[in-house]
Amino acid sequence: MGQKGFYFDQTRCTGCRTCSVACSDLHNYAPDIVLRRVIEFEGGTWKVNTNGTCTQNVFAYYTSIGCNECENPVCVKACPTGAHHKRTEDGLVVIDTEKCIGCGMCAKACPYGSPVLDKAAMKMRKCDGCVARTSKGGMPVCVEACPERALEFGDIE
């Protein structure tokens, strides 16, 4: 097996955040633990014309961010207990919660903000590509939930 990962088609995403909610619901996380973030970028201006009508050039687009399943993940290198590791069978970066001490070193190292602290459990959490599902041939819940099919999961070429 090769490196697994996500493909995001920005042209299809409407910013509905169904992917994010599906992930949180599957794992029963508190509202402050978001492992798949949807970020909105917006800009442009409105102009009132002399005849009282408006002209606009506003825009908005979205990006859905989970874990990038990096080739050389700095979060793994930063983890002092070895709880963060990259699986050899599929390249997914996961956290062994038995080893995790919730120190946050992985979160400080990750340039994408993937690991977050679960304050109730005092453990770090991150998108793991729904490894319990994908290792049995299924798809991550965010991929299945997306109504616009903006997310895909599979081998990275």
Regions found by a protein language model. Give the residues of each.
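Non-ligating segments of multi-cofactor redox enzymes
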Residues: M1-E157
